[in-house]
């Protein structure tokens, strides 16, 4: 079977189009395959953050995306991943703008101007947005948490919680705190499976404002750990940036978001009914085409596979190097 190794902002995945399989995978096999190929130590060619399964979508969409993390859990959405799936479906079906079915919503995606030569980009809708504790599976004694303390976590850092639709906990911090050990300490505790605040876990991001309209986001992703980038985290952080720092940025204005794996651009929108949604614009890089037997992938036998580089990764790295000059 063929898979694609892809990434958005360094957040890397394998794409597997289930329509191309000779034998359909059971639910158990979908999870096991993701766990085997994604393992950073024993997985396929260095592993990945997850597997993006592409399936036929329901009416009104041109495909469905399921996101299985490296630990076998399923994410409701993946902002970096959906851009790479958008590119795959765009090229497969010769479409420039269409909808992709995800767990909670059918999301608009469209081809965007490339970031540089051989660095194609896509624009993905990130929604729905909710601040309700029930949607976040959050227990802090409040219905919403916006720029407030959680004393059990820190007496010095204020947090905001938002689902987009996967849950995010966001804090605006200084550079020293951004790069320090607090993020790992707090996020590890909140994703240990038995804490009372987020019993199902949560994505945790620290955000530093670099200048008006430009932020840096560092994320500990639920089911993954520290990651180069998390698209929904960057979208959620952008939303909170607009809501909490309106003296610097506003709706319908482009925001540059830097992350350990690169950069994206975002824009926060507000519908007439008051609902928020975000545009997430960034690279959709295809690193390699992989061929491996279905049985070997499921069983974690990586002695016999082919790996054909596309050349796009070198172009992406050159683009990122130019950003940091």
From Swiss-Prot:
Organism: Ligilactobacillus salivarius (strain UCC118)
Major location category of this protein: cytoplasm
Gene symbol of the encoding locus: dapF
Residues engaged in binding substrate: 11, 69, 79-80, 166, 203, 221-222, 231-232
Protein's UniProt name: Diaminopimelate epimerase
Catalytic activity, EC: 5.1.1.7
Gene Ontology BP, a term: lysine biosynthetic process via diaminopimelate
Annotated catalytic residues: 78, 230
PANTHER family: DIAMINOPIMELATE EPIMERASE (PTHR31689:SF0), DIAMINOPIMELATE EPIMERASE, CHLOROPLASTIC (PTHR31689)
Site entry: Could be important to modulate the pK values of the two catalytic cysteine residues: 168, 221
Pfam families hit by this protein: DAP_epimerase
Enzyme class: isomerase
Molecular function GO terms recorded: diaminopimelate epimerase activity
Pathway(s) of this molecule: Amino-acid biosynthesis; L-lysine biosynthesis via DAP pathway; DL-2,6-diaminopimelate from LL-2,6-diaminopimelate: step 1/1
Quaternary structure (record): Homodimer.
Family stated for the protein in its record: Belongs to the diaminopimelate epimerase family.
Purpose of the protein: Catalyzes the stereoinversion of LL-2,6-diaminopimelate (L,L-DAP) to meso-diaminopimelate (meso-DAP), a precursor of L-lysine and an essential component of the bacterial peptidoglycan.
Keywords recorded for this protein, A-Z: Amino-acid biosynthesis, Cytoplasm, Isomerase, Lysine biosynthesis
PROSITE patterns, per the entry: DAP_EPIMERASE
Compartments (UniProt record): Cytoplasm
A cellular component term, taken from the record's GO annotations: cytosol
Catalyzed chemical reaction(s): (2S,6S)-2,6-diaminopimelate = meso-2,6-diaminopimelate
């Amino acid at each position: 079977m063929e898979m694609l190794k892809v990434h958005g902002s360094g957040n890397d995945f394998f794409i597997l189009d289930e329509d191309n399989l000779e034998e359909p995978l059971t639910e158990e096999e979908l999870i096991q395959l993701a766990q085997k190929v994604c393992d950073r130590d024993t997985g396929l060619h260095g592993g990945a953050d997850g597997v993006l399964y592409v399936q036929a979508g329901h009416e009104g969409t041109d495909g469905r995306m399921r996101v299985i993390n490296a630990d076998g859990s399923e994410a409701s959405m993946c902002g970096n991943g959906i851009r790479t799936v958008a590119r795959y479906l765009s090229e497969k079906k010769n479409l420039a703008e269409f909808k992709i079915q995800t767990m909670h919503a059918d999301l608009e995606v469209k081809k965007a101007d490339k970031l540089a030569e051989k660095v194609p980009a896509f624009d993905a809708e990130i929604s729905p947005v909710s601040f309700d504790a029930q949607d976040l599976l959050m227990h802090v004694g409040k219905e919403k948490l916006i720029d407030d303390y959680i004393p059990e976590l820190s007496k010095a850092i204020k947090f905001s919680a938002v689902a987009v639709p996967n849950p995010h906990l966001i804090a605006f911090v200084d550079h020293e705190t951004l790069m320090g050990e607090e993020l790992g300490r707090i996020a590890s505790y909140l994703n240990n499976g038995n804490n009372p605040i987020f019993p199902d876990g949560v994505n945790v991001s620290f955000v530093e404002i670099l200048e008006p309209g430009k932020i840096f986001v560092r994320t500990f992703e639920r089911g993954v750990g520290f990651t180069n980038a998390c698209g929904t985290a960057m979208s959620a952080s952008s939303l909170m940036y607009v809501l909490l720092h309106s003296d610097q940025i506003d709706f319908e204005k482009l925001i540059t978001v830097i992350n350990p794996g690169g950069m994206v651009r975002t824009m926060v929108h507000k519908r007439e009914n008051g609902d928020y949604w975000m545009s997430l614009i960034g690279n959709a890089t295809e690193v390699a085409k992989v061929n491996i037997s279905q049985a070997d992938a499921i069983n974690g036998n990586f002695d016999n596979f082919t790996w054909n580089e596309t050349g796009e990764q070198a172009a992406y790295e050159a683009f990122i190097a130019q950003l940091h000059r």
